[in-house]
Amino acid sequence: MFIPKKSKYKKVFKGRIKGNTKGGSTLSFGDYGLKAMEAGRIQSKHIETARRVISRTLKRSGKVWIRIFPDTPVSKKPADVRMGKGKGSVEFWVFKAKPGRMLFEISSDVPMHLARLALEKATAKLPMKCKFVSNHN
């Protein structure tokens, strides 16, 4: 699971995910990628599940880059606890993805049809709409 080693603040406000991504919207490492089409919170377990699906589909060939990291803690109070008495403890970590953000990349030594299949399978494991992008036209 992806968890930061150290964080400046233990807990953060919920906030809103507004606008499009400022950076990280183009392919930087590989020739094929998975781009977010809508805003959403991606948990560390979603990233790990998508990574496993991609590596199994590619049969360990090629290189996979994970372009995101969950750096925002989400707190939750236990069940059957009354309101008040402070904020709950940190339950999991998320990455707040904006539309246009590149999530995963795959190297060019993998055939395009296999890369597309792997990234479409990974899309099913993520809580948002995504699309396949490539450097090849």
Swiss-Prot record:
Keyword presence, Ribosomal protein: yes
Pfam families per record: Ribosomal_L16
GO MF term (any one): rRNA binding
Gene Ontology BP, a term: translation
InterPro entries: Ribosomal_uL16, Ribosomal_uL16_bact-type, Ribosomal_uL16_CS, Ribosomal_uL16_dom, Ribosomal_uL16_sf
A Gene Ontology term for the protein's cellular component: cytosolic large ribosomal subunit
Sorted UniProt keywords: Ribonucleoprotein, Ribosomal protein, RNA-binding, rRNA-binding, tRNA-binding
Keyword RNA-binding applies: yes
UniProt similarity note: Belongs to the universal ribosomal protein uL16 family.
Subunit-level organization: Part of the 50S ribosomal subunit.
Function per UniProt: Binds 23S rRNA and is also seen to make contacts with the A and possibly P site tRNAs.
HAMAP family: Ribosomal_uL16 (MF_01342)
Protein name from the UniProt record: Large ribosomal subunit protein uL16
